[in-house]
């Protein structure tokens, strides 16, 4: 299962700004997705590892985490993000 990280379009940024906000301090934790999550990082820097694959994301990135993904989040700088579960 691949994690997608890219720069969002202006339309995606506008749409995500109406979604809830989640924050997290510097930490490391395991997470499993029972539904797909799309998030727009407003602040912070993270690396998410799924087995041998690692993906980094920073403020301004749009990330999509697929349903069924089990991973480890390493929050290197405090995170603030808008999120949407589908």
Feature map (PLM): residue ranges:
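Cytosolic regulatory regions built on CNB/CRP/Popeye-like sensor folds
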Residues: 1-8, 12-13, 54, 59
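Conserved short histidine dyad/triad with adjacent acidic residue
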Residues: 6, 16-34, 66-68
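Short strand-coil-strand connectors
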Residues: 25, 49-53, 76
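Short hydrophobic/aromatic-rich beta-strand segments that constitute the beta-sheet cores
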Residues: 31, 48, 81-84
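Short, conserved beta-strand element in jelly-roll/cupin
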Residues: 33-48
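Short acidic-glycine-tyrosine-enriched beta hairpin
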Residues: 51-67
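Ligand-binding loop in jelly-roll beta-barrel domains
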Residues: 67-86
